[in-house]
Amino acid sequence: MLFFKKKTNKGQSEPSTNKIRLNTEVTDEVFGKLVYTCVGLWKGFIETELFGIKSTVRVLIYTEEDDGEYVEPEQQQAVREYLSRKNEIDPLIESELRRGYGLDDCFVLSDRFIFDSIHIHSGGDFGFSFIDNTAPEGRSDRNMVVTVIPEVSFFGDEDDYV
């Protein structure tokens, strides 16, 4: 992580917490190692648990600018909020998947859905994408629960996502 010194009004220098891309990589306190992959997109991995299964999933962080900087406190705060409320939010995610697909409480979600990735957007909105093992031929197998933060809401498959 690089730290730059910024000038104060009195000409004194103080450390800046701005992080900047270095060889397309940055270390973030929440996400760990992130790699700048293309215009406005950083990619990393995070270890988490959903449906009672621990896994390492992709984190896709979308930023608005292509200037190489990664300074996204809203996104970091959204993940901190999710992690602090995980026990409250995860059942809502499961409930929304059940509702969206018409599945009863006895259905084991991990039999059908594979937790694929977390998508985090500027401003802190983020959602999870899943791979649906039973997707009909010709349809996308990726399904999303979009906007985990600020609220949990089912959005359907990516063919409907615009």
Task: Please name every model-derived segment.
Residues 2-94:
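N-terminal "domain-start" segment
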Residues 77-139:
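Amphipathic protein-protein interaction modules
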Residues 1-35, 117-162:
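Acidic, proline/glycine-rich low-complexity IDRs
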Residues 68-72, 105-107, 126, 147:
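General structural signal for secondary-structure boundaries
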